[in-house]
Amino acid sequence: MKTKFIFVTGGVVSSIGKGLAAASLGALLESRGLRVTHQKLDPYINVDPGTMSPFQHGEVFVTDDGAETDLDLGHYERYTSARLSKKSNFTTGQVYFSVIEKERRGDYLGGTVQVIPHITDEIKSKIIENAKGSDIAIIEIGGTVGDIESLPFLEAIRQFKADRGAANVLYLHVTLVPFIKTADELKTKPTQHSVKELREIGIQPDILICRCEQDLPRDMKAKIALFCNVEEKAVITSQDAEHIYAVPLALHREGLDEQVVEKLNIWTKAPDLAPWQQVVEKLMNPSHGKVRIAIVGKYVNLTESYKSLSEALTHGGIANDCRVHLTYLDSEKIEQEGIDGLLEDVDGILVPGGFGERGTEGKIKTIEFARTRKIPFFGICLGMQMAVVEYARNVCGLEDAFSSEFKPDCLNPVIHLMEEQKGVSRKGGTMRLGAYPCTLTKGSFAQKAYGTLDISERHRHRYEFNNKNRTVLVENGLVLSGVYKEGDLVEIVEITDHPWFVGCQFHPEFKSKPLNPHPLFKAFIAAALQNKKA
């Protein structure tokens, strides 16, 4: 089958849910037996989001091949079976970088390099390259129609219909139909203007997904269809859902996937949505009540910084048939004001990754609380490193133990810079990134969770466990239960005389899915549930 291309644009406001719409459509088409891939095109000039503040960009999602990408790729991987790569996300910065390199090599034979055709051709070539081997390629354009930064991308996808044939290209526009409380009615004018602007660029949307607080009445769908030049059945309501994993089912009820396969002239089997129905049922009606998990981090004022993490915890709840209630606590506040009263009622504590010294002592206090009070604990990346620091200080008696990242001259740097990172001065794309193998210790918490001895997980770090302190930590009871054998790098630490205490250097949240929860999150929530019952 010749690859079909679906381009997803957004209008009226940012953060309208294009990523979730694209991911949900991918899930629906995959349930029909189609091979789906995803791609996100970001209009900013940064080469990638790896050096951007979490407060500006939210989470950086890491792929198996080490790409630092937009958090929407996390949605795509969670909703489908796709394993995305460096080709799945590119930016204006990458496009211009590539074109300028070609110009310097003389690839354009002395011609004047312009946005059209050179930039648009580069964009199209990257889209085509990523789509190879798939039946459907769903490409989301970042930003909002009308943004000046998006224009080269929109021009490139406009040309796609002429290049690939109208039967192989579909334009899907996600827009807002706001409810005005004072008038007590939904308003279609923002959608009309958004589509008008898109049509002025030369793109006529085939399907509209209308985000709204309440159901769109039929007469309003007819009005939108008339003024936006689409079929009435192609006006899809996307009402605010109680949970994001209910969105694929809601869009299916609206006929989204049926419209897509009809307009692209694809024959498919009937969709099998039973797995999604089971997920939603467990979310809405859990058998075991709820568990309370505290996430103690430094980016808690923007929870999008922990998007994959919060979703992975939800997946752990699905696996244990319970609801997970998350409480976000600022580690810097704990550092300044103490821990009293903040963690008394939680069933489990998670300390996530991060960069910089701010809030680290608050994380260490939190870890000590979890260790001494026997509360199930999960430390990820920096959370694992601070667990090692806490153990070294309070159990091994190494009072000045710390990470050389924060105190280069400390006498006991139990965490230190990786050998291959020494001398690296450039920030972008230079960390230990992507998937690496890890060998587990038989009988450990981690091995019991995975059910195997050999695993592969994704990383994003420069600092590691310092093997010079290995003996003293092990002699005092710290279990090094996961090791990257090639570099003798400690990946997982545990405490055995504890209900569940695990720290890992990698980011397991990047591989968790609602239909296939990650083993460590499944085990962590199970321990928290057991702690609640106790």
Swiss-Prot record:
Residues 1-266 are annotated as: Amidoligase domain. InterPro entries: Class_I_gatase-like, CTP_synthase, CTP_synthase_N, GATASE, GATase1_CTP_Synthase, P-loop_NTPase. Residues 292-534 form the Glutamine amidotransferase type-1 domain. L-glutamine binds at G354, L382, G383, M384, Q385, E405, R462. UTP binds at S14, K187, T188, K189, P190, T191, Q192, K223. ATP binds at S15, I16, G17, K18, G19, L20, D72. It catalyses: UTP + L-glutamine + ATP + H2O = CTP + L-glutamate + ADP + phosphate + 2 H(+); L-glutamine + H2O = L-glutamate + NH4(+); UTP + NH4(+) + ATP = CTP + ADP + phosphate + 2 H(+). Allosterically activated by GTP, when glutamine is the substrate; GTP has no effect on the reaction when ammonia is the substrate. The allosteric effector GTP functions by stabilizing the protein conformation that binds the tetrahedral intermediate(s) formed during glutamine hydrolysis. Inhibited by the product CTP, via allosteric rather than competitive inhibition. One of its GO terms (molecular function) is identical protein binding. The active site is at C381 (nucleophile), H507, E509. One of its GO terms (biological process) is 'de novo' CTP biosynthetic process. Mg(2+) binds at D72, E140. Its EC number is 6.3.4.2. Belongs to the CTP synthase family. NCBIfam families: PRK05380.1, PyrG. Homotetramer. Catalyzes the ATP-dependent amination of UTP to CTP with either L-glutamine or ammonia as the source of nitrogen. Regulates intracellular CTP levels through interactions with the four ribonucleotide triphosphates. CTPSs have evolved a hybrid strategy for distinguishing between UTP and CTP. The overlapping regions of the product feedback inhibitory and substrate sites recognize a common feature in both compounds, the triphosphate moiety. To differentiate isosteric substrate and product pyrimidine rings, an additional pocket far from the expected kinase/ligase catalytic site, specifically recognizes the cytosine and ribose portions of the product inhibitor. This is CTP synthase.
